[in-house]
Regions:
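Conserved glycine-rich cofactor-binding loop
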Residues: 7, 14-15
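Conserved glycine-rich Rossmann-like NAD(P)H-binding loop of the short-chain dehydrogenase/reductase
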Residues: 28-45
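The beta1-alpha1 cofactor-binding region of Rossmann-like NAD(H)/NADP(H)-dependent oxidoreductases
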Residues: 61-71, 103
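Substrate-binding pocket helix/loop in short-chain dehydrogenase/reductase
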Residues: 97-110
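Active-site helix of classical SDR
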Residues: 121, 155-156
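Residue(s) in the substrate-gating loop at a strand-loop-helix junction
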Residues: 141
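C-terminal helical subdomain
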Residues: 179, 192-228, 232
């Protein structure tokens, strides 16, 4: 799909990968709707986009609040008349050992990382199918390819599997579905790590490329393809490495 003139909805757009993606799509000529809980941060991103000559709007959205998503979808479609590109980027990572994470935290992670994106996609997909035009991109994770963190990996495996299955089922519909699986990227989600990481612009560029040239899945940075391949052909080696 040509980005210029298209309408994109990006969730989790107040910072990190979502904010970088919104800026990149706007730079390429899309009309972008930024959705997240922190409206103040969203407005800062919109100000930066408009200052650079782009077009953007804000919707307050808590993706974990499933009951609110019909409102989010209808408001998003009303702003520019339709949604051509949906980037399911919102995600959280609450760290905790198995058996120790509170039930509310489990529900929050599952709803934000998995059930929310599925629900929002279900709400926006009919319009795309009717127009036979649309792009859906789900931001999963390398943790959705390599089982490591018990709940985070569980939600990202689920999102990745959902998107890949949806891609097959929508074949020849005019709607493409792709997965982006980032490794460690320098965002608020990885602030606990004290090592050099690529910036979110790397993933934003990958997402923009998928809009224009759809593919099944992109892993970025590229070197994470190596442990992913090992996980598939020699999982015992990955078991050994993760236990060290």
């Amino acid at each position: 799909m040509k980005i210029a003139g298209a309408v994109a909805l990006v969730t989790g757009a107040s910072s990190g990968i979502g904010a970088a993606t919104a800026r990149e799509l706007a730079r390429r000529g899309a009309r972008v709707i930024l959705a997240a809980r922190r409206v103040d941060l969203l407005r800062e991103q919109v100000a930066a986009i408009t200052a650079a000559g782009g077009q953007a709007s804000v919707i307050e959205a808590d993706i974990s609040d499933l009951a609110s998503l019909p409102r989010v979808a209808s408001e998003a479609e009303a702003i520019y008349g339709q949604i051509d590109i949906l980037v399911n980027n919102a995600g959280i990572h609450i760290r905790g050992k198995p058996g120790q994470l509170a039930p509310d935290d489990i529900a929050l992670m599952v709803n934000t990382n998995l059930t929310g994106p599925i629900t929002l996609t279900r709400l926006l997909l009919p319009g795309m199918l009717q127009r036979r035009r649309g792009v859906i991109i789900c931001v999963a994770s390398v943790a959705g390819n390599i089982a490591n963190d018990w709940l985070y990996s569980g939600t990202k495996f689920g999102l990745r599997g959902y998107a890949l299955a949806l891609r097959r089922q929508l074949h020849s519909s005019g709607v493409s579905v792709s997965v982006v699986s980032p490794g460690y990227i320098d965002t608020p989600l990885t602030s606990y790590r004290h090592s050099r990481m690529p910036g979110p612009a790397l993933i934003a560029n990958a997402i923009a490329a998928l809009v224009e040239r759809p593919r099944r899945e992109v892993v970025a940075p590229w070197w994470y393809r190596i442990p992913i391949a090992l996980e598939r052909i020699a999982p015992w080696l990955v078991d050994f490495g993760l236990r060290r």
